[in-house]
Amino acid sequence: MTEIILVGVMLLSTAGYAFFGGEKSNVEKLDYKGIKFSLGDDGLWHFLIQEQEFATTNNPKETENISSNINLKINDYSQKVLYFSQDSDNQGLQEIARNIERFTTRMWKACLDNCSEDLPIKNCSENIIIIRESSESLIKQEENCVYILFNENDAIRASDAFIFKILGI
């Protein structure tokens, strides 16, 4: 009798695992221009490019309406110092840093002109990203300065659009 109960428990355990266990199949996924995006438990969209993992708050479909007129690629930041203007939006800065800091030698805040903070003064001959609120969301470039302009609470989405652009997505 004990053997029958033991076999029954084993069968029910196996059936339970088959129906309710294992990997989640309801993970949200997106294939965008041949790149596979999956929404992780952390709420970020994870994807691989040349065996490098990236994680963004938004997927590329969610940033398609943000105009981008830049010709920079990730290699333009590789092994170089990347500056952010001292008044850059902090959420946008963190989104970009999470994804491209590993390619730079370091990231630093800087002033575009005199400022009250003790920061270096830089101009557009160096890589500088300026993330500011504006009347519309768009990304533009002047020499090596990239302006990520966002409307209202759109800093992260505009920053993600920049990330996708420099990654060639």
Predicted regions mapped to residue ranges:
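Aromatic-residue detector
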Residues: V7-M10, E28, G34, C124
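Secretory targeting signatures
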Residues: M1-N26
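Long, folded non-catalytic interaction modules
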Residues: L39-I169
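Alpha-helical transmembrane signal-anchor/signal-peptide segments
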Residues: G22-G40
